[in-house]
Amino acid sequence: MANTDRPALPHKRAVPPSRADSGPRRRRTKLLDAVAGFGVTLGSMFKKTVTEEYPERPGPVAARYHGRHQLNRYPDGLEKCIGCELCAWACPADAIYVEGADNTEEERFSPGERYGRVYQINYLRCIGCGLCIEACPTRALTMTYDYELADDNRADLIYEKDRLLAPLLPEMAAPPHPRAPGATDKDYYLGNVTAEGLRGVRESQTTGDSR
Protein backbone atom coordinates (compact mmCIF):
# COMPACT_ATOMS: atom_id res chain seq x y z
CA MET A 1 0.00 0.00 0.00
CA ALA A 2 1.34 3.43 -0.92
CA ASN A 3 2.23 5.82 1.86
CA THR A 4 -0.28 8.66 1.79
CA ASP A 5 1.11 10.42 4.89
CA ARG A 6 4.00 12.10 2.98
CA PRO A 7 3.80 15.88 3.38
CA ALA A 8 3.05 17.78 0.23
CA LEU A 9 5.92 19.78 -1.32
CA PRO A 10 5.56 23.51 -1.12
CA HIS A 11 4.44 25.12 -4.32
CA LYS A 12 7.22 27.05 -6.10
CA ARG A 13 6.18 30.48 -7.04
CA ALA A 14 7.43 31.90 -10.32
CA VAL A 15 9.92 34.71 -9.81
CA PRO A 16 8.89 37.69 -11.86
CA PRO A 17 11.64 39.11 -14.09
CA SER A 18 13.50 42.04 -12.69
CA ARG A 19 12.96 45.39 -14.22
CA ALA A 20 16.74 45.63 -14.65
CA ASP A 21 16.57 42.79 -17.19
CA SER A 22 14.33 44.70 -19.52
CA GLY A 23 14.12 48.13 -21.01
CA PRO A 24 16.87 50.56 -22.06
CA ARG A 25 19.36 49.34 -19.45
CA ARG A 26 19.25 45.78 -20.79
CA ARG A 27 19.75 46.96 -24.36
CA ARG A 28 22.70 49.13 -23.30
CA THR A 29 24.33 46.16 -21.51
CA LYS A 30 24.02 43.96 -24.60
CA LEU A 31 25.61 46.67 -26.73
CA LEU A 32 28.58 46.98 -24.36
CA ASP A 33 29.05 43.20 -24.35
CA ALA A 34 29.19 43.17 -28.14
CA VAL A 35 31.80 45.95 -28.19
CA ALA A 36 33.88 44.21 -25.51
CA GLY A 37 33.93 41.06 -27.63
CA PHE A 38 35.76 42.97 -30.36
CA GLY A 39 38.26 44.47 -27.93
CA VAL A 40 41.06 42.08 -28.85
CA THR A 41 40.37 42.52 -32.55
CA LEU A 42 40.32 46.30 -32.37
CA GLY A 43 43.46 46.35 -30.23
CA SER A 44 45.36 44.17 -32.71
CA MET A 45 44.48 46.40 -35.64
CA PHE A 46 46.95 49.06 -34.52
CA LYS A 47 49.85 46.76 -33.61
CA LYS A 48 52.87 46.17 -35.85
CA THR A 49 52.26 43.30 -38.23
CA VAL A 50 54.24 40.08 -37.83
CA THR A 51 53.65 38.73 -41.32
CA GLU A 52 56.86 37.46 -42.94
CA GLU A 53 57.53 37.60 -46.66
CA TYR A 54 58.05 33.89 -47.14
CA PRO A 55 59.55 32.38 -49.25
CA GLU A 56 61.07 35.59 -50.60
CA ARG A 57 62.60 36.45 -47.22
CA PRO A 58 62.76 33.36 -44.95
CA GLY A 59 63.01 34.22 -41.30
CA PRO A 60 65.76 33.04 -38.94
CA VAL A 61 65.48 29.77 -37.04
CA ALA A 62 66.50 28.92 -33.49
CA ALA A 63 70.11 28.04 -32.76
CA ARG A 64 69.23 24.42 -31.94
CA TYR A 65 66.58 23.98 -34.62
CA HIS A 66 66.06 20.40 -35.85
CA GLY A 67 65.89 20.49 -39.64
CA ARG A 68 67.04 18.14 -42.37
CA HIS A 69 69.67 15.57 -41.39
CA GLN A 70 73.25 15.53 -42.64
CA LEU A 71 75.87 12.78 -42.73
CA ASN A 72 79.18 14.44 -41.90
CA ARG A 73 82.70 13.80 -43.14
CA TYR A 74 86.18 14.00 -41.68
CA PRO A 75 88.51 16.77 -42.92
CA ASP A 76 90.07 14.47 -45.53
CA GLY A 77 86.68 13.42 -46.94
CA LEU A 78 86.18 10.02 -45.27
CA GLU A 79 82.69 9.45 -43.88
CA LYS A 80 82.01 9.54 -40.15
CA CYS A 81 79.18 7.00 -40.30
CA ILE A 82 80.29 3.53 -39.16
CA GLY A 83 77.03 1.73 -39.98
CA CYS A 84 76.28 0.82 -36.35
CA GLU A 85 72.51 1.40 -36.81
CA LEU A 86 72.14 3.00 -33.37
CA CYS A 87 70.28 5.90 -34.96
CA ALA A 88 67.76 3.50 -36.50
CA TRP A 89 67.24 1.76 -33.16
CA ALA A 90 66.75 5.09 -31.37
CA CYS A 91 64.19 6.43 -33.86
CA PRO A 92 60.68 6.24 -32.31
CA ALA A 93 59.02 6.65 -35.72
CA ASP A 94 61.02 3.93 -37.51
CA ALA A 95 62.06 6.52 -40.10
CA ILE A 96 65.73 5.47 -40.49
CA TYR A 97 67.08 2.45 -42.34
CA VAL A 98 70.80 1.58 -42.30
CA GLU A 99 72.83 -1.23 -43.82
CA GLY A 100 76.47 -1.46 -42.76
CA ALA A 101 79.32 -2.99 -44.74
CA ASP A 102 83.00 -3.75 -44.16
CA ASN A 103 85.80 -1.47 -45.30
CA THR A 104 88.84 -2.85 -47.08
CA GLU A 105 92.23 -1.29 -47.65
CA GLU A 106 91.47 -1.20 -51.37
CA GLU A 107 88.04 0.41 -50.86
CA ARG A 108 87.72 2.48 -47.69
CA PHE A 109 84.82 4.86 -47.01
CA SER A 110 85.37 5.48 -43.28
CA PRO A 111 88.37 5.19 -40.93
CA GLY A 112 87.03 2.21 -38.96
CA GLU A 113 86.11 -1.36 -39.83
CA ARG A 114 82.63 -0.60 -41.17
CA TYR A 115 80.71 2.14 -42.93
CA GLY A 116 77.10 2.86 -43.80
CA ARG A 117 76.58 1.34 -47.25
CA VAL A 118 72.85 2.13 -47.31
CA TYR A 119 71.36 5.05 -45.40
CA GLN A 120 67.75 6.18 -45.76
CA ILE A 121 65.59 8.65 -43.85
CA ASN A 122 61.86 8.67 -44.50
CA TYR A 123 60.67 12.25 -43.95
CA LEU A 124 57.08 11.09 -44.24
CA ARG A 125 57.64 9.53 -40.80
CA CYS A 126 60.36 11.69 -39.22
CA ILE A 127 59.10 13.80 -36.30
CA GLY A 128 62.29 15.83 -35.84
CA CYS A 129 62.85 14.72 -32.25
CA GLY A 130 66.65 14.52 -32.53
CA LEU A 131 67.02 11.21 -30.69
CA CYS A 132 69.00 9.82 -33.63
CA ILE A 133 71.74 12.44 -33.38
CA GLU A 134 72.03 11.87 -29.64
CA ALA A 135 72.54 8.14 -30.22
CA CYS A 136 75.27 8.59 -32.85
CA PRO A 137 78.67 7.69 -31.29
CA THR A 138 80.80 9.49 -33.91
CA ARG A 139 78.75 12.65 -34.50
CA ALA A 140 78.23 11.41 -38.03
CA LEU A 141 74.57 12.45 -38.01
CA THR A 142 73.54 16.02 -37.24
CA MET A 143 70.57 18.20 -38.14
CA THR A 144 70.78 21.32 -40.27
CA TYR A 145 68.63 24.46 -40.45
CA ASP A 146 67.03 23.36 -43.73
CA TYR A 147 63.28 22.99 -43.18
CA GLU A 148 61.95 23.22 -46.74
CA LEU A 149 61.16 19.54 -47.24
CA ALA A 150 57.71 19.78 -48.84
CA ASP A 151 57.22 17.85 -52.07
CA ASP A 152 54.36 16.70 -54.27
CA ASN A 153 55.89 13.24 -54.69
CA ARG A 154 55.97 10.96 -51.66
CA ALA A 155 58.87 8.92 -53.01
CA ASP A 156 61.08 12.02 -53.12
CA LEU A 157 60.70 12.43 -49.35
CA ILE A 158 62.67 9.24 -48.74
CA TYR A 159 66.21 10.61 -48.70
CA GLU A 160 69.03 8.30 -49.75
CA LYS A 161 72.64 8.53 -48.64
CA ASP A 162 73.72 10.68 -51.58
CA ARG A 163 71.23 13.39 -50.57
CA LEU A 164 72.21 13.27 -46.91
CA LEU A 165 76.01 13.35 -47.22
CA ALA A 166 77.72 16.66 -46.52
CA PRO A 167 79.16 18.23 -49.68
CA LEU A 168 82.85 17.76 -50.38
CA LEU A 169 84.98 20.80 -49.62
CA PRO A 170 87.83 21.72 -51.98
CA GLU A 171 90.45 20.22 -49.66
CA MET A 172 88.58 16.92 -49.32
CA ALA A 173 88.99 13.80 -51.45
CA ALA A 174 85.96 11.75 -52.43
CA PRO A 175 85.99 8.27 -50.86
CA PRO A 176 86.92 5.53 -51.23
CA HIS A 177 90.54 6.34 -50.40
CA PRO A 178 93.07 5.21 -47.74
CA ARG A 179 93.41 6.72 -44.31
CA ALA A 180 95.93 9.49 -43.74
CA PRO A 181 99.49 8.07 -43.58
CA GLY A 182 100.22 6.80 -40.09
CA ALA A 183 96.69 7.48 -38.81
CA THR A 184 94.34 5.05 -37.09
CA ASP A 185 90.60 5.22 -36.63
CA LYS A 186 91.22 6.56 -33.11
CA ASP A 187 93.18 9.49 -34.54
CA TYR A 188 90.16 10.36 -36.64
CA TYR A 189 87.77 10.13 -33.70
CA LEU A 190 90.04 12.33 -31.55
CA GLY A 191 90.24 14.99 -34.25
CA ASN A 192 93.95 14.55 -34.94
CA VAL A 193 93.51 14.25 -38.70
CA THR A 194 93.25 17.31 -40.92
CA ALA A 195 92.82 17.72 -44.64
CA GLU A 196 96.61 17.55 -45.05
CA GLY A 197 97.00 14.37 -43.02
CA LEU A 198 97.76 13.27 -39.47
CA ARG A 199 98.62 16.27 -37.32
CA GLY A 200 101.29 14.55 -35.22
CA VAL A 201 103.05 13.03 -38.24
CA ARG A 202 103.08 16.32 -40.11
CA GLU A 203 104.45 18.20 -37.12
CA SER A 204 107.19 15.62 -36.53
CA GLN A 205 108.16 15.71 -40.20
CA THR A 206 108.34 19.48 -40.07
CA THR A 207 110.53 19.32 -36.96
CA GLY A 208 112.83 16.74 -38.59
CA ASP A 209 113.22 18.83 -41.74
CA SER A 210 114.12 21.90 -39.70
CA ARG A 211 116.92 20.00 -37.99
Swiss-Prot record:
A Pfam family: Fer4_7
Region (Disordered): 1-27
Membrane topology, record value: Peripheral membrane protein
Superkingdom of origin: Bacteria
Enzyme Commission no: 7.1.1.-
Gene Ontology biological process terms, A to Z: aerobic respiration
Complexes and interactors: NDH-1 is composed of 14 different subunits. Subunits NuoA, H, J, K, L, M, N constitute the membrane sector of the complex.
Co-factor remark: Binds 2 [4Fe-4S] clusters per subunit.
Lineage, top ranks: Bacteria, Bacillati, Actinomycetota, Actinomycetes, Mycobacteriales
Keywords on record: 4Fe-4S, Cell membrane, Iron, Iron-sulfur, Membrane, Metal-binding, NAD, Quinone, Repeat, Translocase
Amino acids binding [4Fe-4S] cluster 2: 91, 126, 129, 132
Residues holding [4Fe-4S] cluster 1: 81, 84, 87, 136
Function: NDH-1 shuttles electrons from NADH, via FMN and iron-sulfur (Fe-S) centers, to quinones in the respiratory chain. The immediate electron acceptor for the enzyme in this species is believed to be menaquinone. Couples the redox reaction to proton translocation (for every two electrons transferred, four hydrogen ions are translocated across the cytoplasmic membrane), and thus conserves the redox energy in a proton gradient.
Species name: Mycobacterium bovis (strain ATCC BAA-935 / AF2122/97)
Span of domain 4Fe-4S ferredoxin-type: 71-101, 117-146
This protein's name: NADH-quinone oxidoreductase subunit I
